[in-house]
């Protein structure tokens, strides 16, 4: 696996190294040894799948509060998404900064989102599925989020947001 750093400390783009032959290819999307060697969360508690019917659907920006803060490892398994993470760690040099990465069924890249960062995505085509591993179990009382259009972050989404849940539209703006 190839690990590419991002401007946000602790966040990585992970590229599986495919071994191809006439049948197709094989690649690892997670390896405890390789993640531990970089000081990254070695274990995950849950794997989630999100399916979206329509291009432009926006989900997020989500995170869990302490003591249920979580690491996420996000991958698009079908279709294409623009995945965004925002650094919400007040002591971080990149506090309130964001990174966006296009994850597709073809590039097989994963985004490693560290604790203390919010994450969300927008679908770039119809019929898109994403899969993400989390280091903590879902804790409804700790579920939180910030608005996708918060001017404190200035996120530039690639498409107009055509479908957003009521819950995601009701997240508060982050204090400036």
Question: Residues of each region from the PLM?
Answer:
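Conserved SET/PR-domain catalytic core that frames the SAM/AdoMet-binding pocket
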Residues: 104-121
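Short catalytic/ligand-binding loop motif for oxyanion handling, primarily in non-cytosolic enzymes
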Residues: 26, 121-122
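Non-catalytic, conserved peripheral segments adjacent to functional cores
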Residues: 1-109, 127, 134-176
């Amino acid at each position: 696996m190839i690990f590419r750093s991002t401007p946000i400390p602790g966040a990585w783009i992970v590229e599986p190294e495919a071994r191809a032959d006439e049948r197709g290819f094989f690649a690892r999307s997670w390896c405890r040894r390789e993640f531990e060697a970089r000081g990254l969360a070695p274990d995950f508690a849950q794997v989630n799948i999100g399916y979206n019917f329509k291009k432009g659907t926006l989900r997020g920006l989500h995170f869990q509060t302490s003591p249920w803060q979580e690491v996420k490892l996000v991958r698009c398994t079908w279709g294409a998404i623009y995945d965004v993470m925002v650094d919400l760690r007040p002591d971080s040099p990149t506090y309130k900064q964001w990174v966006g990465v296009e994850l597709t069924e073809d590039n097989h890249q994963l985004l490693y989102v560290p604790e203390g960062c919010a994450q969300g995505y927008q679908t770039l085509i119809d019929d898109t599925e994403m899969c993400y591993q989390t280091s903590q179990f879902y804790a409804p009382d700790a579920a939180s989020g910030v608005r996708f259009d918060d001017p404190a972050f200035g996120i530039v989404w690639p498409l107009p947001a055509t479908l957003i849940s009521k819950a995601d539209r009701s997240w508060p703006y982050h204090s400036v």
